[in-house]
């Protein structure tokens, strides 16, 4: 495992699907931004209120939902170590 130096996840993207005013979303985004800054991954935030109806139906009760390179990674909370490991894992 890497020693924490940046660059491990360059080119990877973590997307958070959430809502404005959601305290769990705010907490999750703090973790996502910290891990992505450390590893060199990109952060993308999408607003569930502006998402297509199908996506709102699928994820409404799970926000925040996190995706790594488009694949669902987690929902409700973001575990820092688990996200870090997912970003370091080669696909």
Question: Residue spans of the language-model regions?
Answer:
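Short Fe-S-cluster ligation motifs
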Residues: 51-64
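Local sequence-structure signature of Cys/Sec-based thiol-disulfide redox active-site neighborhoods
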Residues: 2-34
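A short, hydrophobic beta-strand/beta-hairpin element that forms part of a small beta-sheet core
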Residues: 63-72
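Short, charged, intrinsically disordered terminal tails
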Residues: 56, 77-79, 85-91
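N-terminal, polar/charged subdomain of small-to-medium soluble alpha/beta proteins
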Residues: 50-54, 72-77
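Short helix-loop-beta junction
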Residues: 35-39
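Thiol-based oxidoreductase modules, predominantly thioredoxin-like and allied folds used
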Residues: 41-53
